[in-house]
Amino acid sequence: MANNKVLIFDTTLRDGEQSAGIGLTVEEKLVVAKQLERLGVDIIEAGFAASSPGDHEAITTITNEVKTPIIASLARCVESDIDVAWDALKKAERPRIHTFISSSDVHLMDILNKDPEQVLTMAVKSVERAKKYCDDVEFSPMDATRTDLEYLYRLIEATITAGATTINVPDTVGYTIPSEFRQRIELIKNNVPNIDKAILSVHCHNDLGNAAANSIAAVEAGARQVEGCINGLGERAGNASLEEVIMTIHTREDVFGLTTNVDTTQIYPTSRLVSDILSLIHISEPTRLGMISYAVFCLK
């Protein structure tokens, strides 16, 4: 891949569906996926196959009809999740298994009840298992922006050695700000010996309103895949708005010297389609501020 190309990873059908009050049928997901293909996104995360029969069916349906982009399924670092993800993806022209596990101390203690070495072993084994099914494997250390840096370097290095071709750095709770996120990406690039063997990706949440800015800061630092949702959909206050990220890269090519594969003339039709299917109304700034405030309250 050319070093000036930023890959666009759309997770509207997975993380976007976690927005409050949103649920899509298999047929609606297929309609959105076909429009995302017209838009020119590089990767469509079509769902989380192990989470429900509906997600499994949606992924399978999309793989049968959408052939140009990579189709991904999310999977926890659990053998059965990896197996179910592959079962849903096996007919895809370009399948990707995206596996994740928490990595911050707070998540390890309060959610997983495991120590760092146990988590590292689980991550490596899951990447190795996914690699037996397909060449394209993405790994995400969940809550990476609150993870001890030395441990994060080790975890990333180990999963790349195990076969991960994309390493995604999630700001899971929307905690960071652009300057420190940029620094974290730079530190990863400078301290993980085999980082050149994987594409570095970012996945930013908007709890403090910084998701798009954090994504752009990461791109400036060398990330070459950005994850986000159409219309900034997503859990709590949402994900990075892909429209904002894409148009920043395209409009300010003079600054970044970067491009994407997106057909920008399809951004408006895609946004409208998603809005119409979800019966969304324009979210005013006071409403958005309320959503962000609520998200911050929930995370305390």
What is the predicted role of each segment?
Residues 1-78:
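N-terminal capping/small domains of soluble enzymes
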Residues 8-11, 44-46, 70-75, 95-99, ...:
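Hydrophobic faces of well-ordered beta-strands that scaffold small-molecule active sites
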Residues 24-41, 64, 79-137, 142-195, ...:
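Alpha/beta enzyme core
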Residues 281-300:
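Single conserved hydrophobic/aromatic residue that forms the stacking wall/gate
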